[in-house]
Amino acid sequence: MSFATTNKTIVPCATTKQIVRPRFLSNGTISKSRAMMVWEPFNNKFFETFSYLPPLTDDQITKQVDYILRNNWTPCLEFAGSDQAYVTHDNTVRMGDCASTYQDNRYWTMWKLPMFGCIDGSQVLTEISACTKAFPDAYIRLVCFDANRQVQISGFLVHRPESATDYRLPADRQV
């Protein structure tokens, strides 16, 4: 067998690009550097859902209650003094080495009964006002239960006592 050779030039299909690596690392612009700040560990405690937000207004609470009712869940108010509101060694019966925030054998006192017949947010606001008037130095949270699954679905703080020193405004939460 004989092979014929020709003088053809071979052109590559694609040229390779040189990779240029930056000489330094950056997180972007200087305005994004706030995301890299240090969390303030003192007097900066949170309760469940929405705790990272400023205190909820009555309108915001009403919208949350409307969402709860649209899902056929039952709202309920609970309250606790500042000595019982957070998990500590003194107020928690531990079954093991650790404690979470809900299943820790530390229960808040229920305000009246769950609001089975509740039809709008104004009824819950009336009960929050009554509970705040009766216990002005207590933390008050709104929880909701799903009767079908028999579990607590959500819980969030609706009243923080005036004397509370454990809350920081969002702008003051980082160093």
Curated annotation (Swiss-Prot):
Database matches in Pfam families: RuBisCO_small
Principal subcellular localisation of the protein: plastid
CDD domains named in the record: RuBisCO_small
GO annotation (BP), single: reductive pentose-phosphate cycle
GO cellular component: chloroplast
Keywords: Calvin cycle, Carbon dioxide fixation, Chloroplast, Photorespiration, Photosynthesis, Plastid, Transit peptide
SMART domains in alphabetical order: RuBisCO_small
Organism domain of life: Eukaryota
Transit peptide: 1-34
Location relative to the cell: Plastid, Chloroplast
Keyword Chloroplast appears in the UniProt entry: yes
Coiled-coil stretches noted in the UniProt entry, renumbered to this chain: none
Cysteine-cysteine disulfides: none
InterPro entries, A to Z: RuBisCO_ssu (IPR024681), RuBisCO_ssu_dom (IPR000894), RuBisCO_ssu_sf (IPR036385)
One GO MF term attached to the UniProt entry: ribulose-bisphosphate carboxylase activity
Family: Belongs to the RuBisCO small chain family.
Quaternary structure and interacting proteins, as annotated: Heterohexadecamer of 8 large and 8 small subunits.
HAMAP family on file: RuBisCO_S_bact (MF_00859)
Function comment: RuBisCO catalyzes two reactions: the carboxylation of D-ribulose 1,5-bisphosphate, the primary event in carbon dioxide fixation, as well as the oxidative fragmentation of the pentose substrate. Both reactions occur simultaneously and in competition at the same active site. Although the small subunit is not catalytic it is essential for maximal activity.
Extra facts: The basic functional RuBisCO is composed of a large chain homodimer in a 'head-to-tail' conformation. In form I RuBisCO this homodimer is arranged in a barrel-like tetramer with the small subunits forming a tetrameric 'cap' on each end of the 'barrel'.
Listed name of the protein: Ribulose bisphosphate carboxylase small subunit, chloroplastic
Organism: Batophora oerstedii (Green alga)
